[in-house]
Amino acid sequence: MGTGQTLLTIMAMLMLSRLILSVNTNTAQNGASIEMAAYRITASSLGFSIIEEASGLAFDQASVASNITATSQLSTTLGPETGEVYPNFNDFDDFNGLVKIDTVANSAVFKTTVVVQYVTVSGSSIVVSSTPTYSKQITVKVSSVSMSDTLIFQDVMSYWYFR
């Protein structure tokens, strides 16, 4: 083998090494992207589950057994009443202050925190209210050390009574 052939062989080996390194890097990056997508799907599922669960309950403790005809009948303190613990909540605002840790099989550990507030809805604007209103907003935050960001989900529940 002459000097030219040796040089060509070395260049071919370098190019092959670079190609293999590039393929491995892309495979690792794709694997990380797929893993992150799976974490986000799981986190979304956990967040929406809380919202769906809360939305299926009564609007307020005062509306569990009877109808509300004035905002003065609504609870001034949002959160679970004495003796109520998750998952045995009976109204929407019981979820206020909930912190839930979920470990999904073969996945990350997720922390879910919930805040419920009275809001005033006017057109497309939603403003937090310090006094009871016929609308409450739930904010669910799902985070994990395995994710680079926190997913935030919000929904508004309003009380409607028809005579």
Regions found by a protein language model. Give the residues of each.
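Aliphatic-rich helix starts adjacent to a transmembrane/signal segment
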Residues: G4-F48
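Low-complexity, Gly/Pro-rich coil/beta segments used as flexible assembly/activation regions
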Residues: I41-R163
